[in-house]
């Protein structure tokens, strides 16, 4: 029995939700998102909340039950509040700046990296060593943050590189003589 799936998804104030067949659409102050629920899961609107139930008690249906509920909850939060991820850049000469519709990263390579910002994502650089990624789609915000971090992930010896804000980097000691 899925503990996540059992709880209905409350529709936040200021958000309109519609359920047509297997599609859940939500519209809020930040934008509009939709999610197609897998066929192994039933979805219905009851008392201002969205309820998710598995079609049967098979393993795949029960697996998708909690996942579908979490996806719908993320859509509800995204269209009302939005999502944000912060990245920190550590290292001498490592910096980030906005260049039109792209993010320009100087990460110690012989060339600068131009990252094209996808639609639906807003990137800001309050400081040259900070990047703020925001949007309404949680998966997309996390994916963009992971792609930027991948260009120069934090290394364990000096801690240089791009890391998530608040991320702990396991440090190693250099070799001894």
Swiss-Prot record:
What does UniProt give as the signal peptide span?
A: none
Entries under SUPFAM superfamilies matching the protein:
Ribosomal protein L6 (SSF56053)
Which PROSITE patterns does the record associate with it? RIBOSOMAL_L6_1 (PS00525)
One GO molecular-function entry:
rRNA binding
Q: Which GO terms describe its biological process?
A: cytoplasmic translation
What's in the keyword line of the UniProt record?
Ribonucleoprotein, Ribosomal protein, RNA-binding, rRNA-binding
Its GO CC terms are: cytosolic large ribosomal subunit
Q: What's the stated role of this polypeptide?
A: This protein binds to the 23S rRNA, and is important in its secondary structure. It is located near the subunit interface in the base of the L7/L12 stalk, and near the tRNA binding site of the peptidyltransferase center.
Write down the HAMAP family for this protein, in alphabetical order.
Answer: Ribosomal_uL6_B (MF_01365_B)
Quaternary structure (record) = Part of the 50S ribosomal subunit.
Q: Show the NCBIfam families listed in the entry.
A: L6_bact
By sequence similarity, the record places it as follows:
Belongs to the universal ribosomal protein uL6 family.
From the Swiss-Prot or TrEMBL record, give the protein name: Large ribosomal subunit protein uL6
Per the UniProt record, the source organism is Methylobacterium radiotolerans (strain ATCC 27329 / DSM 1819 / JCM 2831 / NBRC 15690 / NCIMB 10815 / 0-1)
């Amino acid at each position: 029995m899925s503990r996540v799936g059992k709880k209905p998804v409350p529709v936040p104030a200021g958000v309109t939700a519609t359920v047509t067949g297997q599609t859940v659409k939500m519209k809020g102050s930040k934008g509009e998102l939709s999610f197609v629920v897998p066929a192994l899961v039933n979805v219905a609107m009851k008392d201002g909340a969205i309820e998710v139930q598995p079609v049967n008690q098979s393993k795949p249906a029960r697996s998708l039950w909690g996942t579908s509920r979490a996806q719908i909850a993320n859509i509800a939060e995204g269209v009302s509040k939005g999502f944000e991820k912060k990245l920190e850049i550590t290292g001498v000469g490592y910096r980030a700046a906005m260049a039109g519709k792209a993010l320009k990263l100087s990460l110690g390579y012989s060339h600068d990296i131009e990252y094209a910002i996808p639609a639906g994502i807003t990137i800001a650089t309050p400081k040259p060593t900070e990047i703020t990624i925001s949007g309404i789609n949680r998966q997309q915000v996390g994916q963009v943050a992971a792609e930027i971090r991948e260009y120069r992930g934090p290394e364990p010896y000096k801690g240089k590189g791009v890391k998530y804000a608040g991320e702990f980097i396991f440090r190693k000691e250099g070799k001894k003589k």
